[in-house]
Amino acid sequence: RARTLGEGHMSWAHANAGRLAIDFNQGLWDEHTGMQRMNYALEVAGTEFSGWNKPPPGKRDAWPPAQLTPLPWVEHEGRAPTKMTIYNLNMTHGRWHRVLAEGINGVGLVAEWCPSPWVLVDLTPPTAGRAIIVRTSDEAFSGNPSDALFQSRTDFVYMTLRDFDDEESGMFAFQISLIGADGWPISLEQQVQHSSLVQFPVSLRHRQSFRVKIRAQNYAGLEVTVTSATQVVTDATPPVLSHVSDFGLGEYELDLIKGPDLDWVVMWEAYDEESGVEDLE
């Protein structure tokens, strides 16, 4: 029996770019005279079945269906192939398609039409979204996270993937990698299948800058590539305190009134060459 070759994906989404991969399970054969010829045909469901959530029923009223597009017949010797790919199909985006196979043995006897499951054809890549690098995992779940300019960790990069979408076959996976300031990759590509919070393991150096590159794939195997908007600098060292003094010592001669909440006051100077000083307490 014929079926679509889903490669681990949903069977309704594997057709793209005018080709359809078919898995005939154990193949079609005749133990006496062998399979000498296979006829194939392509069927397109009516417009009432448009959309991925409306698959047609297994069989139609007329069998085999009257509206079939014949495909080139194929000569075989003894046994039909278990897997094959049919190219240059005139398929319609967003419509359900299936292939029917008819086998003829060595003495001309014809097997019944064997249909594959219906496959929704998706010929468009996903809608590009945004890859936002954040400093903490909590920031990834905020309503409108801002792009980080610096991060202190060298072992992980936290990010959230927003607004990636595919109306036809849906989002399948995200292939993530880091690229340096020169555009060359600085990490291996890894695959994730979620987008709210991604914890990407890396090995970064102090002062190393990077961007995130995303290849977003839908279930039909089509993809869109996105690079994060900002370049992030790794700052793995704390700020430097250059001067600490209490008022009243050295050149600072001030009269202070002690109170219950004030014992002494200090002055300090701090700087950070990489990411700057964000706050003083």
Question: Model-flagged regions — what are they?
Answer:
Residues 1-281:
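Low-complexity, disordered linker/stalk regions enriched in Pro/Thr/Ser/Gly
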